[in-house]
Swiss-Prot record:
Family: Belongs to the G-protein coupled receptor 1 family.
Annotated compartments: Cell membrane; Cell projection, Axon; Perikaryon; Cell projection, Dendrite
Transmembrane segments: 10-34, 46-68, 89-98
Keywords noted in UniProt: Cell membrane, Cell projection, Endosome, G-protein coupled receptor, Lipoprotein, Membrane, Palmitate, Phosphoprotein, Receptor, Transducer, Transmembrane, Transmembrane helix, Ubl conjugation
Chief location: membrane
UniProt keyword Transmembrane helix, yes or no: yes
Any GO BP annotation: negative regulation of nitric oxide biosynthetic process
Extracellular side: 35-45
GO MF annotation list: beta-endorphin receptor activity; G protein-coupled receptor activity; G-protein alpha-subunit binding; G-protein beta-subunit binding; morphine receptor activity; neuropeptide binding; voltage-gated calcium channel activity
Topology versus the membrane: Multi-pass membrane protein
GO cellular component: axon; dendrite; endosome; perikaryon; plasma membrane; synapse
Natural source organism: Cavia porcellus
Protein name: Mu-type opioid receptor
One Pfam family linked to the record: 7tm_1
């Protein structure tokens, strides 16, 4: 269990969480597509669109963060020992969500 608490695994979990939350909007978008209109009201429309965009940008930021993390791990392995910690990964993920 403790071996699973690496920076890479924390980023992967964050990406999976963002994608799972994005799939929660799919039923609403499917109904909208099939009916050709939005039957759920204005407030739910704004909530679903907000969740969808929020998770889309979080996924993009997380993928960029993972790319930078891999770059540091491969190109600067000595510096990576200090930088790639679970605590730093959690801090970066919180910033991605905000």
């Amino acid at each position: 269990y403790t071996k699973m608490k690496t920076a890479t695994n924390i980023y992967i979990f964050n990406l999976a969480l963002a994608d799972a939350l994005a799939t929660s909007t799919l039923p609403f978008q499917s109904v909208n597509y099939l009916m050709g209109t939005w039957p759920f009201g204005t407030i739910l429309c704004k909530i679903v669109i907000s969740i969808d965009y929020y998770n889309m940008f979080t996924s993009i930021f997380t993928l960029c963060t993972m790319s930078v993390d891999r770059y540091i791990a491969v190109c600067h392995p000595v510096k990576a020992l200090d930088f790639r910690t679970p605590r730093n990964a959690k801090t970066v993920n919180v910033c991605n969500w905000i």
